[in-house]
Amino acid sequence: MKAVVLALTLAFVAGQNFAPEFAAGKTYVYKYEALILGGLPEEGLARAGLKISTKLLLSAADQNTYMLKLVEPELSEYSGIWPKDPAVPATKLTAALAPQLAIPIKFEYTNGVVGKVFAPEEVSTLVLNIYRGILNILQLNIKKTHKVYDLQEVGTQGVCKTLYSISEDARIENILLTKTRDLSNCQERLNKDIGLAYTEKCDKCQEETKNLRGTTTLSYVLKPVADAVMILKAYVNELIQFSPFSEANGAAQMRTKQSLEFLEIEKEPIPSVKAEYRHRGSLKYEFSDELLQTPLQLIKISDAPAQVAEVLKHLATYNIEDVHENAPLKFLELVQLLRIARYEDLEMYWNQYKKMSPHRHWFLDTIPATGTFAGLRFIKEKFMAEEITIAEAAQAFITAVHMVTADPEVIKLFESLVDSDKVVENPLLREVVFLGYGTMVNKYCNKTVDCPVELIKPIQQRLSDAIAKNEEENIILYIKVLGNAGHPSSFKSLTKIMPIHGTAAVSLPMTIHVEAIMALRNIAKKESRMVQELALQLYMDKALHPELRMLSCIVLFETSPSMGLVTTVANSVKTEENLQVASFTYSHMKSLSRSPATIHPDVAAACSAAMKILGTKLDRLSLRYSKAVHVDLYNSSLAVGAAATAFYINDAATFMPKSFVAKTKGFIAGSTAEVLEIGANIEGLQELILKNPALSESTDRITKMKRVIKALSEWRSLPTSKPLASVYVKFFGQEIGFANIDKPMIDKAVKFGKELPIQEYGREALKALLLSGINFHYAKPVLAAEMRRILPTVAGIPMELSLYSAAVAAASVEIKPNTSPRLSADFDVKTLLETDVELKAEIRPMVAMDTYAVMGLNTDIFQAALVARAKLHSVVPAKIAARLNIKEGDFKLEALPVDVPENITSMNVTTFAVARNIEEPLVERITPLLPTKVLVPIPIRRHTSKLDPTRNSMLDSSELLPMEEEDVEPIPEYKFRRFAKKYCAKHIGVGLKACFKFASQNGASIQDIVLYKLAGSHNFSFSVTPIEGEVVERLEMEVKVGAKAAEKLVKRINLSEDEETEEGGPVLVKLNKILSSRRNSSSSSSSSSSSSSESRSSRSSSSSSSSSRSSRKIDLAARTNSSSSSSSRRSRSSSSSSSSSSSSSSSSSSSSRRSSSSSSSSSSSSSRSSRRVNSTRSSSSSSRTSSASSLASFFSDSSSSSSSSDRRSKEVMEKFQRLHKKMVASGSSASSVEAIYKEKKYLGEEEAVVAVILRAVKADKRMVGYQLGFYLDKPNARVQIIVANISSDSNWRICADAVVLSKHKVTTKISWGEQCRKYSTNVTGETGIVSSSPAARLRVSWERLPSTLKRYGKMVNKYVPVKILSDLIHTKRENSTRNISVIAVATSEKTIDIITKTPMSSVYNVTMHLPMCIPIDEIKGLSPFDEVIDKIHFMVSKAAAAECSFVEDTLYTFNNRSYKNKMPSSCYQVAAQDCTDELKFMVLLRKDSSEQHHINVKISEIDIDMFPKDDNVTVKVNEMEIPPPACLTATQQLPLKIKTKRRGLAVYAPSHGLQEVYFDRKTWRIKVADWMKGKTCGLCGKADGEIRQEYHTPNGRVAKNSISFAHSWILPAESCRDASECRLKLESVQLEKQLTIHGEDSTCFSVEPVPRCLPGCLPVKTTPVTVGFSCLASDPQTSVYDRSVDLRQTTQAHLACSCNTKCS
């Protein structure tokens, strides 16, 4: 029956107004409660929040206008263990808000929809938002004909998708309505972001896991009444969860529960208030003072000036000697106080503190951190009034740019600054302000849907004016500003200066084009499609400079191109002729193809497909070609990632790159940000350093060279590059600074430096240091991070997610001088040299940093939040005393005891819930997130809401849940994990112990995930403390230089005995020897004992015949006296020193047999491939006559080698020892080394030149440490270093002895252990020549080495298996020789053969190809320059020079391409020249009638002719012949040198880019400096590494064959009377037959010049050449050389002509 009644009721209501209504003349009384709590989901943990309880009076005030009043409101704070602890009434806060809460508000309400809200001005925005939270419950959009539907509905939090569900309760005849609002699906979501202007949303990251989710459920019980429905009950349950990581790793929650229960209807209306009601918005939340309020502390401002004064005093007083642990929080308090200050207040504070140095410093550092317009205006006004320095202004502006919230008012202020003369006059400030202007526009546009074009128009206009005036520096600056702003309207302005074909912008300098392309990247973030099209157009333009195309590629891939676009680029790369562009694009796509799917999913997939198209061919290009590297990592579980990208751009395959860019990107919590980017252009750095300082601009030089090149057909010079180095820095995608360095700037800086009285400043600083000392304190506060997101809850209370990080760094330096004798005030340097100076310094660097992560409620009157706080404090004090006596050569440094805190560095991380309110500023209710005591699981009856004291049937519905249930449940018990570890390391010598301690109590026992592991408390600390019983009084280092150095040595070495002098006399010495010999005898059975050397000596003696035969092989050093192998057993040192020679010449017979058989069987030839390793048991024979194969025989210890190997070894030995002929005079042989050691094992005190003592002085005056003695024996060219332990009970020491046997050989013996006897090794290094190639050998032999070396070697070999290392590990086998030899032979300037012989007699041969040239001639002492500076200059230039050569009628270009050059008779060809307008050099080549080559070199005003004459090569300089031997020395006026070299002559002019021109009767060779690569042209090519575009003709066209290319570089004759006897001219030839093109008869002319005889001459020598022809029906106006090619045909080119007398 009830169901029927309800059905009839619903049917009746469907025809009526189905919306809540409140009848006029009645007052509806409701009870309202709201509880907002934040914390982790589990019960038994701490939460913080706010509770609101009140009665509501609701009545109609007018038609569709209602009045709402709160009665007996009560606010309660919650900070405790939920649900055990109760909320605490905030009586004072309630009383403070009571006057506002007592004022009723009015609102429009029509058909269940809340409209405008009205309230008096006395009602604050905060209280009005609480009303909005109540009105949100009344918002009902009920449709008459639908039971389930959704719509975008207005609510407190914005306009979000809301799902309605309507049902009926047949038992009580009520309507049940539920609506669910998805806060992640909103048309308009109300929130405010602060400090997040530079972050971007990572869409793909958010697809995998949502970091911020929210949903609101509202459940209603509606009762049908006469004309509408009445709300009986309403429950609201909202959940907002935030996960800093992935959702699987835990999330913190903010829960809001509201309840509204109908109580009664009163007939008395709500009493009216005498106040003016104003329109105060709508149902939507309104942001207010919470934007300025930090969530870390509440400050009740009663007397702002006094509070500011107190905080400033605290910061200035307590951060001098040490940084106070609360300094960061106090700094944040000062920020908060100044953030709410008006400009007038700041002016008042400034006048009060500007003359108080520490207060002024703290004040100026805090103002920019406030991020307010008033603060920015204050900085501007003080700078304009010159009350702050330029340094203070620059620092303040840089900080303010990134802290100030951007709005039109702030942008206008920056606009006024850019016009200020004071800013324009200072380059640094001008740059900061202009770039800041662009940043402000960018920040404002990021948060505004429609960003006004007017904001950026001033810069666009400036750019247009600068282009019109050709002001390059200003153009670059304005482009950077537009790039920072990233406004889409700037796209048109930037397009106008792009190097698009056919536009006027093509003529602009390339630096402008570079900046314009890079400025597109920020625009691409908003208009990717538009930028994408332009970038692709630039990239596909093959005529564009390669660097610009590569930059376009960077921009293109930052726009997230589609699969089709990436495929288009890949197909373009397949046919790309420029290898720089191909290499860069390929490497870029390859790097992106490996990117994780989360970071670049679409681009990575597209690039993976592109890699399949391209293959791996381009992988073989070397590092001289441009590359892009992208590396990224993303952890989905933590939702954290990082990416790093590096672009290496080159355009001429030079040794140094033209430019590079490196940038990093971070991913965290679903957002991404470009953290840091650094770029540099060093294109002109080499040229700036190595180029001749000033080229002569004389008319004669320029005219001569231009006259020559004018003869070339359609000559077009390359643009002259301006020597320039530039660097820029970007932070969060915004350029914050850049610098362009060129020659004028350097000259200006040098001039400025000369004008400054630097010497005077230095003298005054030295006087201040030595007379009065230094006492310096400095502190710097930094607000490193302030990132906030504020969003309203359904109850109208704002919640906040924020991250704060503040730090205060300080340093205290105090230096006290003491001089003896005391210096006068006007002392000079001479006096100082005779003064004993002592300085005592105490240094205390300190830092304190606080970091807060907050989630909770934040208003200007109350706060309740969950907080994670990390406090870092670090102090590293040091006290040092230094003493210097230059006259005596004494230096002493002491580290003195200093007060060290318990922990040098400590960090405490705690998580807690906190609640506070403004009326009780000294009361903070803090509850640790994890309870400190384990909870007892006893049943607790929870607090039951009084809204429904009796359970009724309505509560049985699953759709409606009361705010707090009555179920009795035990509170869960958690056993929280406690973890503590301590790691210590101590050093007895210095008496200190260092400990790292870690203690943690976390919630991993609740859930073993990241968030719960971080919850709780954690402590990290690092301490350094004295060791008990080993306290050190001080650490000392003493240095003594000079003849009296030995006086400082603590331990003396006996000059006649092997032992140290010890107390006890000779008896103890003899006893020591006896015990030592017994120890040796007892260990004779061990292979590693010292007696093994004796057994090897005996084996060596028994096989003397084998050794004598083997010793005939090359030994790089003079022969060793064989008697050394049988030296007395008493002299262990002598035995050890000779072991290397004896072991290298002796081996077992089995080893010899194996070596012989292996040698005879290994006859395979070795190739010259780079780094190919041949490993054999003996020498590998090679099919080619190479130094590698010859040197392989050096290592054969066998006497049964083949005769050919013996002959080769003997031949190589003779060649190698050519440079050792002069060694005999110095007496440097192996036997002399033994004689030197035998004569005097230890050098005496008179040879000591340096003594160094390192010691620690203990509290009981004991000294421990080491001494180092440096001895020099000049007559024998011997150096000895002895390091000894100065403890009386220790005989440990290191002995190193080096003897220079000749200028080509040095040997070193190193031994260590007890009395330098336990371990020893010999190292011999020598140089020589093998097959005319410089060579060097390093031989290392040892007697015994520590076992730890072998252990570590095994560990390394386990992870990095290397055969050589494996051989070294197994040296204890019977056939091992305990030595290793390495020989390096420079077979050419770019290749080295390295041959290594291991102790297992294995030989490894590696041929290495080097990226640069080895200065072989300089090694041989054949440098063309005598001065050291000139030599260095020459060698640096030569290292990466490009070479072009002519050998046996084949020309090898700079790019190593070869072709046959069919040279014309008597006509010059341009072999190589500087193709820029500077014309630094030119090399011409011709062949005379007798088929002899002539070379002409033009450098500066000098003409050099080299040609064969008789059997020699002759040189003329400016038509004056220089008699042999030709030699011309470089001078400042003559920047070149001519020198005889081998069988010819060589010209050197590296400062002009011409490294070397060598010429003899059969060959010639041209080398250009590395910085000239890409700027040359001629027969030798451009030296740019572009082998696919090798044949560039003078007009820039690429010829299809080498013949046409070579002919284009002929210098034609002007007439038959030309002195050079050249009778050729270059002309376009007509094709003999006519062709029909497009239906018309056309005449065809060659578009490439062809050499033909002059009129009146007949060809006597021709050659066929294929050239391109252009065919047209009529004669066009354009030059034939500019036409396109229609077909290619073969024609005849003339090479030699015969002329008659009529030839003119």
Curated annotation (Swiss-Prot):
Matching SMART domains: DUF1943, DUF1944, LPD_N, VWD
Residues bearing attached sugar chains per UniProt: 446, 635, 903, 908, 1019, 1054, 1080, 1121, 1174, 1285, 1322, 1375, 1379, 1405, 1456, 1512
Bilayer-crossing regions: none
Boundaries of every VWFD domain copy: 1442-1617
Spans annotated as Disordered: 1078-1213
InterPro entries: Lipid_transp_b-sht_shell, Lipovitellin_superhlx_dom, Vitellinogen_b-sht_N, Vitellinogen_b-sht_shell, Vitellinogen_b-sht_shell_sf, Vitellinogen_open_b-sht, Vitellinogen_open_b-sht_sub1, Vitellogenin/Apolipophorin
GO annotation, biological process: cellular response to estrogen stimulus; response to estradiol
Signal peptide: 1-14
Residue ranges annotated for the Vitellogenin domain, each copy included: 22-660
Keywords, ordered alphabetically: Disulfide bond, Glycoprotein, Phosphoprotein, Signal, Storage protein
Keyword Cell membrane included in the entry's annotation: no
Modifications after synthesis and translation: Phosvitin, an egg yolk storage protein, is one of the most highly phosphorylated (10%) proteins in nature.
GO molecular function: lipid transporter activity; nutrient reservoir activity
Record bears the keyword Iron: no
Disulphide bonds in the chain: 1444-1580, 1467-1616
Listed Low complexity bias regions: 1078-1109, 1122-1204
Tissue: Produced by the liver, secreted into the blood and then sequestered by receptor mediated endocytosis into growing oocytes, where it is generally cleaved, giving rise to the respective yolk components composed of complex suite of small cleavage products.
PROSITE patterns in UniProt: VITELLOGENIN (PS51211), VWFD (PS51233)
Function comment: Precursor of the major egg-yolk proteins that are sources of nutrients during early development of oviparous organisms.
Name of the molecule in the record: Vitellogenin-1
Name of the gene encoding the protein in the UniProt record: vtg1
